[in-house]
Amino acid sequence: MPSTPTLIFIIIFYLVSLASMLQNGFMMIVLGREWMRNRTLPAADMIVASLASSRFCLHGIAILANLLASFDFCYQANLIGILWDFTNTLIFWLTAWLAIFYCVKISSFSHPVLFWLKWRISQLVPRLLVVSLIIGGLSAVISATGNFMANQMTISQGFHGNCTFGHMSLDFYRYYYLYHSVLMWFTPFFLFLVSVIVLMFSLYQHVEKMRGHRPGPWDLHTQAHTMALKSLTFFFIFYIFFFLALVISSTKRKSMQSYYWAREAIIYTGIFLNSIILLFSNPKLRKALKMRF
């Protein structure tokens, strides 16, 4: 029987995951219907729809993997873990492309590269989505290779017991997984970081200029840009929060008790909060939500 704190984190993890699946499922349905009705979607909505679909799958995979690991279905849990790596890497790259897209479209900096991208990035989005799938597939191959090697080592050492301890008790697997995480996650995270910082700085400059020309506190344009800046700031904070929790969890020995469930609750709460901001910052999704409720 798990301790009370562990039980609380388990409940938080499952509730947050189910709520996030409902939320991302709603986003998928709204944007999917528009995609089918118009046979096309704006470039930004295309990325958002892909991101919502990936997050929906990630939460489902996490629930299934944890249930399998809890009942010591080691082989099945490891197979699901490979699919998790694919989906998680895909989410990192989709988030990076979304940040770059908004940075290019909204920022007011007059750099030749930004001008060139402003006219072409919408046409590049389908290709970027394909690139994300390819990188996700590469991540899955690397993960599958590491799992196979760890399985052989575990068998050769005659390990028996909880499958969650099996792989992560091996120094080889923990370092292998850490290097894999650095290779697959840090590049899109860095692109996201730079894009959001540039966009936030550009929005801040724009808000200050508008306040100087329109000193009225209730100016609608200033309010809209201020709200966008606040939403972006919260998205930025929650995403860093999620990323750090994920990296820390990749360097620690996993346990089905104690800290494992705390890390799971923190990581998936971060994804859930990011999805909330994404939902309310999209006019189409916000309108659809108001019509439903």
Swiss-Prot record:
Pfam families: TAS2R. CDD domains: 7tm_TAS2R16. The gene is Tas2r143. The lineage of its organism: Eukaryota, Metazoa, Chordata, Craniata, Vertebrata. Residues 28-55, 101-127, 203-227, 286-293 are cytoplasmic. GO terms for molecular function: bitter taste receptor activity; G protein-coupled receptor activity; taste receptor activity. This is Taste receptor type 2 member 143. One of its GO terms (cellular component) is membrane. It comes from Mus musculus (Mouse). The keyword DNA-binding does not apply.
